[in-house]
């Protein structure tokens, strides 16, 4: 039962990432860095910080939502691909900015989210 819930939550997170990514790409059609994945990862980290700070004792809910949904919503693999693509295109500065903003933003986002719930 937990495996099915985990798969469904991961699927929902992935579909939401796909939808939001398309919305962001339509809003910012030619960004200098991959803004959509960066925003999604920061937003997902922020929301995960809020979720973790709720202190939910139910291990199943924590795994399904924390790992399933947020694991499907955020994406380290696409972030890695995009950073390497920028490097391969000899856009070293853009890659460095993308990596720095995504990593600092995601960690800072998680911290900020975790601070919202005392």
Swiss-Prot record:
UniProt catalytic activity: fluoride(in) = fluoride(out)
Binding site for Na(+): 71, 74
Membrane topology: Multi-pass membrane protein
Single GO MF descriptor: metal ion binding
Subcellular location: Cell membrane
A Gene Ontology biological process term: cellular detoxification of fluoride
Transmembrane segments: 1-21, 36-56, 61-81, 97-117
Keyword Amino-acid biosynthesis: no
Principal place of residence: membrane
Keywords: Cell membrane, Ion channel, Ion transport, Membrane, Metal-binding, Sodium, Transmembrane, Transmembrane helix, Transport
Record text on activity regulation: Na(+) is not transported, but it plays an essential structural role and its presence is essential for fluoride channel function.
Family in the record: Belongs to the fluoride channel Fluc/FEX (TC 1.A.43) family.
Protein name (Swiss-Prot/TrEMBL): Fluoride-specific ion channel FluC 1
Organism, as annotated: Bacillus licheniformis (strain ATCC 14580 / DSM 13 / JCM 2505 / CCUG 7422 / NBRC 12200 / NCIMB 9375 / NCTC 10341 / NRRL NRS-1264 / Gibson 46)
Highest classification ranks of the organism: Bacteria, Bacillati, Bacillota, Bacilli, Bacillales
């Amino acid at each position: 039962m937990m495996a099915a819930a985990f798969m469904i939550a991961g699927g929902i997170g992935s579909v939401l990432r796909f939808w939001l990514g398309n919305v962001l790409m339509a809003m910012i059609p030619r960004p200098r860095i991959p803004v959509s994945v960066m925003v999604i990862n920061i937003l997902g980290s922020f929301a995960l910080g809020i979720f973790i700070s709720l202190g939910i004792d139910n291990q199943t809910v924590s795994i399904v939502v924390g790992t399933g949904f947020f694991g499907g919503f955020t994406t380290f693999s696409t972030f890695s691909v995009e950073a390497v693509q920028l490097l391969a295109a000899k856009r070293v500065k853009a890659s460095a900015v993308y990596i720095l903003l995504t990593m600092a933003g995601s960690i800072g986002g998680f911290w900020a989210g975790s601070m919202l719930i005392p």
